[in-house]
Amino acid sequence: MLPRSLGHSTSELSPPFDGPNGVERYVSETRSLLRKGYEKYLRRGVPFQMRNPVEELGAQVVLPPKYLDEVKRAPTDLFSFEAYSEKAFLLNYSRAPRQTEAAAHIVRVDLTRNLGKLITFYSDFAIFEVCLPLVLIRDLGALVTDLWNESALYLDKTYNSEWQTKQAYEVVCGFVARVTSVAMVGAPLCRNPVWNRIVVETTMASFGAAQAIKDKYSARWRWLAPWSESIQKDLRRIRKESIELLKPLYEDRKAAVSRSDDVQGSSEMFRDTLYWLITSNQKDRSLSGITESQLFLSLAAIHTTSATLNSFVYDWIAHPEYHGEILAEVKETLAQVQLNGGKWTLQHVAMLRKLDSFMKESARINPIGFVSIQRYTLKPYTFKDGFQLPAGVSFVFHSDGVHHDADNYPDPEKFDAYRHLHLRETVDPNRFHFASVSDSALGFGAGNHACPGRFLSAIIMKFFLIQFMTAYEMKYEHGGIERLPNHDNSNTTAPNRTVNLLVRRCDGTSNNA
């Protein structure tokens, strides 16, 4: 079935069908259906509507890029991501962790601020200047060095010189959970296996609860779900374990704030989201309230970063033609880090221009989602050209279509690892970084509501790839280098989960600082 085009409102539909209209088709063929809609409608600036397998959201409206500016400027009481998530994941019934403004703020401001002092005299750093007020910038790479040291320590303790067989996602997810936790709770809790299990389980428990509700209750009876022990037990266990682990850290940070007349002074002691949440304007700053925000941050960060990194690993294996030049760039950067006493700064991260471009191209060709900027309308809205969206409608932008539009990216099906580096050199040095967002780069969203954790995520993934380029060996257990097909599911996709990797540490090498 082709997507259905819209006229001036969502009630004006044309119904040309060319195939079955069952839910299964919209689960397994979403990417191709969206591509058809992009070519037939979105390229001409026309919205269209197609079935959404998530029944709670109703049919989804797919908007063309010309509406991006209006959506980016719209207030959250008009177009809401929180309301979209609430319906998509049944948050009112599952009681899964929710986003809070404080959690988003501390990632957007406090966390990114502590990634390093953003030097302004290199064009490579201009992207950070655009995204952050300069007055908030401090700490010369302190957190970046912490992330690097923990990444080296984790891998050194996990792998030895003997080949180990591991499922590919397990390799990356364990790394991401451990290193992300440096920014969430710091050492030593980031090394606690129970904590690392919790941050991995939170997403699966939340999605599992939503699916169990759909399976057990019709829409009329879902109000019973919060009292269902079978549905709530995993999330209750996770909350209980998290509170027990976080309590000593919570009390330490509260005491430090109480002792210090200067919050700035106590911030030198702690560089983690737990501390920043305690000192934030979050209404509920009790231990349970802070724990809830911490669980949301893990839900938002761990599996999206892991899936993206998993995809990078497959593309790295599939494209050995780029290994030599990127490895040379990495070694040059590591040499500069050593000259700085082993301390990383964002200057060093910005030297990895070829690696950054490789990652952005991998994410363009093999994204983890086909749409972005998902919103739910809380009020009716009429766009400048007269197109009307009523209240109670979910809409998205087709990021995968934008990223495969030949007007944006010539020869769009070709994997060109240096495509974005060339664009930085010839078009705009500030627009084509991995973490940058623009009207032609929608993977992280758009505007003020773009993913606030993308800078942290980018650094963690770069550190994994650097470690494996220089101190480890990694290859497919089944042999060869060809990337296996992704697993598509509705608007999302995932790198093939059936793949096993052979991993070992190279003899006599270590990047541990």
Swiss-Prot record:
SUPFAM superfamilies: Cytochrome P450. Keywords: Heme, Iron, Metal-binding, Monooxygenase, Oxidoreductase. It comes from the Eukaryota. Cytochrome P450 monooxygenase; part of the gene cluster that mediates the biosynthesis of a tyrosine-derived cytochalasan acting as a fungal signal recognized by resistant rice plants and leads to avirulence in Pi33 resistant rice cultivars. The first step in the pathway is catalyzed by the hybrid PKS-NRPS ACE1, assisted by the enoyl reductase RAP1, that are responsible for fusion of the tyrosine precursor and the polyketide backbone. InterPro entries: Cyt_P450 (IPR001128), Cyt_P450_CS (IPR017972), Cyt_P450_E_grp-IV (IPR002403), Cyt_P450_sf (IPR036396). Induction: Expressed exclusively during fungal penetration of host leaves, the time point at which plant defense reactions are triggered. This is Cytochrome P450 monooxygenase CYP3. GO terms for molecular function: heme binding; iron ion binding; monooxygenase activity; oxidoreductase activity, acting on paired donors, with incorporation or reduction of molecular oxygen. Its EC number is 1.-.-.-. Heme binds at residue 451. Pathway: Secondary metabolite biosynthesis. Residues 1-21 are annotated as: Disordered. Its cofactor is heme. One of its GO terms (biological process) is secondary metabolic process. PROSITE patterns: CYTOCHROME_P450. Belongs to the cytochrome P450 family. The keyword Heme applies. The lineage of its organism: Eukaryota, Fungi, Dikarya, Ascomycota, Pezizomycotina.
